[in-house]
Every structure is written in structure tokens, then in C-alpha cells.
Amino acid sequence: MTRTVDEIKYETPSSWEHKSLDVAEDGRRLAPHSDTARPKGRIRRSMTACHTCRKLKTRCDLDPRGHACRRCLSLRIDCKLPETTDRFQDSAAMWPDATSAIPSIEERLTSLERCMREMTGMMRQMLDHSPGFANASVPHLTKSIITDENASMEGSPSSPFLPKPVRLIQDLQSDFFGEAETSPVDSPLSSDGNAKGAIDSKLSLKLLQTFVDHFGACVSIYNLSDIHNDMKAPDSLLYNTACLLASRYVPGIPTSTVHAIYLQVRHAVVNILWEKPPLKYETLQALALLCLWPATAQKEPPMDSWLLSGISINHAIIALDFLNYAPSEVMVDNETAAQLRLWNTYCLTQLHFAVGNARPFHIQQRYLDHCPRILEHPAATLEDARVVAEIQLYLMTLRLQSNSSRMRLADLDYEEIERWKREWAHLFSGESSTLELSLWFCQTLLHRTAMRLQPRSDRLASEVLQTSRLIISRFLQIRYSTALSLVDQVYFIVGYAALNLCDFNLMDPLIEQVQMFLLHLSPNEDHIAYRFSCMVAEFKRRCGSAECNDPSSTVKGSPLSSYGDSRKMSMGQAPFMPPLMDGMIEGYGFEQLMPEVMPSSFPDGILNGMPVTGLAAYRSATL
């Protein structure tokens, strides 16, 4: 190899010879005193390196922003490097743009995280606009709702591909009964004794006691003394709500009076929700009751519990002090336990109608973490445990529905739900327990969601049919006095199960049994049970009429059932069915019923004379 030395300039020999040199004792010549003894073209390299670079025999470059070399910084080890001015100048000269060109590790990680968030957001937008993956963008949970289990549930979007049982039932009622119109408010709870339909003090006391016995526990009202005198004023929302709910147990109250109370409550709610926060505690109690029983008077448009609970939750976050602290920082005393019970009611109602309407769920995880704390209180009840268990169940349902890959697998059993069943199995027993109804309802929704991706799955269709029969069979065993105080969500669960039976097996005897049970259960024609009974009967009649008129379009032309008519049982396939009264399930005894408050028959026009508009008009695609 030829070495190029063109750029190296040496001084003239004459000058070189006249340089003074140091001579060692052994005669060897040492370096001259002057720097000119070194050739000017040689690169001036730093002879100082840290211990690591010297050991690895690698280049040691100092980071201008720190006191360590780049290799030690990247390896995250201590850099044993003497701090010298020459060293810093050498590195700075060789890396003049190091500050701007090579960021630190923390800056790199921050940049990568930002890019990942942007990419994730773009992917979600793409999935939202893709019909095949639309239900991948539904709420995530427990840590909040989005596709990943550790993502946030805040502002979770809804999906048009999810079943909407509550919306479906409300649409069917509007179709069968017509749109309701709001009437002017005329309060019967007036201090004026001459007012039309006014409730006197003796009757109001009876209503309050009935309310305490059947409804008060869910908002920590166990005695009449828990309702203070200022809460018993005619303009008190809690007082009006208590009288409204208790009226179903007092058949002597005229329907017009109950209707007027309902209108006044609606009017008061509209005004209160716009009041400056924080709201009074008794007002929050009344709002929680109305979230649980929004459809008290069915002649009026029902209050939207999803919207009502959402606004009430915002007021509760401001009014309830314990929500301002971490769960571990809160001592669960009697007052906090009552507030936790109220908060859990709001969370559960928001979940009920977020799932039932396929709407977003907005409660942040840090607020949801407070829900199980009520079980730490020594006076916690089984009902408190049921509410906590149901909150967890609906959160899991939202998470599973939002996971399109899990829905495509079309599992009949989900590991999360099986764990939940083992944890809360002790709450399934008991005549008044409705936890199993919620479990079967959530399983039905998961199977219905999976059927959108597996439209011809016989396994899923069979599972929906079986689960719907379990719901109705269990509901028919509930006693009359208990059934009247059930929250409206239970009636939506039972109504949806009955519609599923009409969809899969029109000849199932449970359809007529639950229809009659709802009819005899209702204290008046405004009660939700009465309207649901009429709805099931009319839905079944239209299904049967449409199939008889056009057998070829039985299910194939229905947007509801895209899995074909093979799931339907014909008259020839149906097993022998005993008469209705002989086939009643044990526990459904007519001695429980109150003849004086039973409507004698369906109103004219509900079941007769209504035109059959075709299967697609009333069998909603969202069932």
C-alpha cells in the first residue's frame, strides 16, 4: 500500500537540525521542546477516554449537554471520565450540532409515545369509517373503554352494529301505541285542600311509609325519620317522587292524580338540573330514584335515564366530597356509605342504558374505583353487593362488545364472565335476586352481537333462545309484591327476552305466560308492565299474521333475522303444549294477584283492528 503524504508539510532540514533536543542518560533522543517538532498535518486526537471506552477500545465522544460520553449514556452506566476543557472542546468541535441532531433518551421516548398516539387515533378513525370493523370502536372498560384493556373508557363511541334492546322496545311502543304528547302541569300535591285531586296529609303519610318499605333502601332511607320535614313540602322533588313510586301499591288513588304527580315531577326535574351546583343531597336522592324508575307513567314520553343519570353524575361529582380523593384516602363511615350507595346507583343506571341503547359510557375509572368501597362498611347489605357485582358485569359486557376479534370467535362462554360468576355466585340465590336476569341479559347481548359477524351460527341462535327462556322462567317465579318494586331495567330485560322468543320460536308457551303475568302484575294502564304485556301480545300477533299471509317471507325478508327461517319452529315441529294455566311454572300463583287493581282487558284497538304492516316494519334489525 502506498501512503500519501502530499498534504503533510515538513520544515526545511536546516531548521530541523538547529532544534534543541533533550537527550536521556542512556543516549536516546527525546521529543524537542517546541511543538514545531511535530508535523503540522497530524490529526490532534484526544488521549483521554473513559474507563468503558478504553476497555472496549472504542471511540469516546463526550455529549456536550452532559458529563458523560455517548456510549455510557446509551448503556445507562456511570461514565468514569475526567472533566477537562480540552476534552469538551474536542467533542464540541466534532459534534457542533449534537444538541439538535441527537435527542436524549427521554426525548426519544416522548416522541415515540406521541407518534403511537397519533397512529392509534388514525387507526380508530379508519375503523370507525369501515363497516366491517365498526364495532371495534366501542367503549373499553374497567380501566375505561376502548379496544385495549388498559385504554380509557372516557367518551367511548357507540356502534350502529350493537343491539339496542331499550331503543327497540321504545320504538315498538311508539309504533303500537302512538307517540305520547306531554300535557300541561297541574300539581295535585298542593297545600290547597280544595285543589282538584289533591292528596291529603293522611294519604301522603301512607304513601311515604309505602315508599320507605319498598323503595327507600336504594337511597339509604330506612325510616320516615330519614325524610326531614323540609323534604315533605309539596314542592320537594324527593317527596313528589316518593308519592309517585308508592302510588302503585295504593290502588285507590285515581289515575288522573298519579298522572298529574308524574307531570309535576318531570317539570321539577327539568328546572332542578339547570340549577347552580352543588345540588342538595335529597335532590340527588330523588334523581337517583327517577333514574331507576324512569317509565313510571307510560302515557308520557319516558324520561331518558341515560341522559338523566349522566347529568346527575356531573352534579354528584361536585356535591359528593369523597369523589375528590383517591379511594384509599377515604374512610367509609356511615355518611360516606350512604353517599357511596347513591353513587353506585348512578353508575349502574348509566351502565344499564349505555348498554341498552348502545350509547357512550363516560364515567372515568378513578370515579368507578370508589364503587366497591361500600362493601368495606360493616352495615353493607346483599343489595349493595349485588349493585357492585352488576356494575362489574356491565363493564365486562361493554369491553367484550368493543372487541371485534372476540366477537368474531363467537364464544358461548367467556372467561371473564365465568370468573365473575364464581366470585358472585353467593348472590344468585334468593327470591328477590335479579342478578341472574342481568347475567343472562348480558350473555344474550353478547350472542346477538356475535351473530352480526356470524349471521348463520346455529350455536348462537340456540344459545339466545335458551337464555331468553331462562330469563322468563326466572321472572315468572318472582312474587307479586316483589315484582312491583323491581326497577324498570328488569322489565326491559324480560321484554327483550320475550321478543327474542317471538323471533326464534313463535309457539313457545312462555310467551303467553309472561304476557299474562305482566298484564295481571300492572296496577293500572300506565304501568310499564301493562304496556310491555300489550307490546309482546301485539308483536307476536303481527309475527304470526305476517307468516300466515306470506310464508315465503317468514324470516328471509326480515332484517331482524338474517340467519334464515331454519331457526323457526313450525306448528308441526312444536311439541305438545298444555293449556296456559296448567303449564304455569311453580311460583306463579294467581293468589298473589290483586283483582281490584287488575285491568279487565286490553284497550280497544291495541290487539284488534291494527293492520299488519309487513314483517320488516315491526321486526327491528336491532333486536
Swiss-Prot record:
It comes from the Eukaryota. This is Transcriptional activator of proteases prtT. The keyword Transferase does not apply. Residues 50-79 bind DNA. Keywords: DNA-binding, Metal-binding, Nucleus, Transcription, Transcription regulation, Zinc. GO terms for cellular component: nucleus. GO terms for biological process: positive regulation of DNA-templated transcription; regulation of protein catabolic process. Its main location: nucleus. InterPro entries: prtT (IPR051089), Zn2-C6_fun-type_DNA-bd_sf (IPR036864), Zn2Cys6_DnaBD (IPR001138). The keyword Cell cycle does not apply. It holds the Pfam family Zn_clus. Belongs to the prtT family. SUPFAM superfamilies: Zn2/Cys6 DNA-binding domain. GO terms for molecular function: DNA-binding transcription factor activity, RNA polymerase II-specific; transcription cis-regulatory region binding; zinc ion binding. It is found in: Nucleus. Transcription factor required for protein utilization and degradation. Regulates transcription of major secreted proteases.
